[in-house]
Amino acid sequence: DLEEGLLDSSKLPRIIIDPYNSLSFKKEKDLEFKDTVVTLLIDNSGSMRGRPITIAALCADILSRTLERCSVKVEILGFTTKNWKGGKSREKWNKLGKLKNPGRLNDLRHIIYKSADTHWRQSKKNLGLMLKEGLLKENIDGEAITWAFNRLKKRKEERKILMVISDGAPVDDSTLSVNSGDFLEKHLKQTVKSIENK
């Protein structure tokens, strides 16, 4: 208990209980700030159309500007599929005789709106591409998280943070029509668990 310094908020309840107790202070100390990079991975699926994708783009813009002022590098990524209801992946599966349990049957589209080494001012217009008509299709979250994580782990920064902005579970009609109904969700959970254990 010091007489001056930074207010010790952990001791405030005792002042509320007994207002005659004196305020408690603690000594300020400068901590070394770890070199940090943040990756924002944004769901660019059709269910995000309208207000949700607008809010996600605004959040990415605000977070990027704010964190860069604190010397934190920010990467902004997006994920969707190239097609509705399959694409070359599904065509290939059809040509090969429609094998059982084929796995993913859509082509991925992973987008780099802003790389970590690019300043916000140079890439702010890219965020508007999220609002482009026809971009938002389906979402295969597990593979997108793996992609973002692999990009992040190549970075030299000491502290690495991956944030995902999404409105729900992964959905790809082409994949789910021939695999189990929870195929993509199970893969997502396995992916997250695997990354958390590294």
Which residue ranges define each predicted feature?
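Acidic, glycine-rich A-domain
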Residues: 1-198
